[in-house]
Amino acid sequence: MLLMLAQWLQDDFGFFRVFNYITFRAVMATVTALLIGLAAGPWVIRKLAALKVGQAVRTDGPQTHLVKSGTPTMGGVLILIGIFISCILWADLSNRFIWIVMIVTFGFGLVGWVDDYRKVVYKDPKGMASRGKFFWQTLIGLFAAIYLAFSVSEVNNLKVLQLFYKWLRSGFALDLPAKTNLLLPFMKEVSYPLGIMGFIILSYLVIVGSSNAVNLTDGLDGLVIMPVILVGAALGAFAYVMGNAIYAKYLLFPYIPGAGELMIFCGAMGGAGLAFLWYNTHPAQVFMGDVGALALGGALGTIAVIVRQEIVLFVMGGIFVAETISVMLQVFWFKVTKKHFGEGRRIFRMAPLHHHFELGGWKETQVVVRFWIITILLVLIGLSSLKLR
């Protein structure tokens, strides 16, 4: 919104030309979201506490968590408010990628809100029925995946519709441009053609998988938000490079017109995340809830698909991956051993993985900071693929 105003005024007031720089608007989006979060935080926390949306704590988990019972949850609303207001102010609202990421973020956030609401208001520990949650996640994920299959290689929505029409006329046999290929990190100009169905399936898995992986990681004070900020910032760097024809050519990446604007969203997500961390750091005054975790994970997955960095997301989000795998292995092994031995056995003391380390003697803050350190290292590895090719 401010960009349109600045472009209208820049002929008379030259200093407004600074708004044309994505880097400037990304910084301002970060600061704006941070200030909104810090200012609105106390009010949001008071409202959540007044509504008695307190977090229920598992009695079979670490006993140190019992004191957290009743702490307001659904604090992810604070993050989403900061992101959306900041993006509306600083992003180019004619950019199709900004809108698809915001739609996915809002959609997953809405699913998470319903899940949280049922848990804390209706006192239903299961929350939203798993089938219902999966249905809505699938609907949102497929919508984004199908749109991006025809959007990543084009410059505007008219071209997107034309490509989609060509695909229909070809009897679903049209090949996508090379820009939609799966990029292999650390490999110079090596990519794997996915085809339209392959692109849609992979994109769906990345978007929905990332959403659920971030949600599983959200279990300790401050644990998930810092990795989200770090991975989001790195994806913002990839978006800036691949949205710039000169940098993309120099670094041997496909040029994706409009992708650079996602740096604004990543900046807003980082600023809103830091503001949330201010209130979520141990001992937490508020928890993120599914409304925040599902939304942020979906946003990361969608951005990774747009900038063709699905594998790099897998690397940089290694903590999310490890947490998810720990849950899958625990459930699988429990069911297998129960079937064969009559009682379920466990691989980990408790899943997700962060609880395993807690029950092993690590303090909560030790788990959190060490997971942050691991994420920093993984993000540096991911960023190195910008040049090491």
UniProtKB/Swiss-Prot annotation:
The keyword Amino-acid biosynthesis does not apply. The chain crosses the membrane at residues 25-45, 73-93, 97-117, 134-154, 190-210, 222-242, 258-278, 286-306, 311-331, 366-386. InterPro entries: Glycosyl_transferase_4, PNAcMuramoyl-5peptid_Trfase, PNAcMuramoyl-5peptid_Trfase_CS. GO terms for cellular component: plasma membrane. It catalyses: UDP-N-acetyl-alpha-D-muramoyl-L-alanyl-gamma-D-glutamyl-meso-2,6-diaminopimeloyl-D-alanyl-D-alanine + di-trans,octa-cis-undecaprenyl phosphate = di-trans,octa-cis-undecaprenyl diphospho-N-acetyl-alpha-D-muramoyl-L-alanyl-D-glutamyl-meso-2,6-diaminopimeloyl-D-alanyl-D-alanine + UMP. One of its GO terms (biological process) is cell division. HAMAP family: MraY. NCBIfam families: mraY. This is Phospho-N-acetylmuramoyl-pentapeptide-transferase. It comes from Polynucleobacter necessarius subsp. necessarius (strain STIR1). The lineage of its organism: Bacteria, Pseudomonadati, Pseudomonadota, Betaproteobacteria, Burkholderiales.
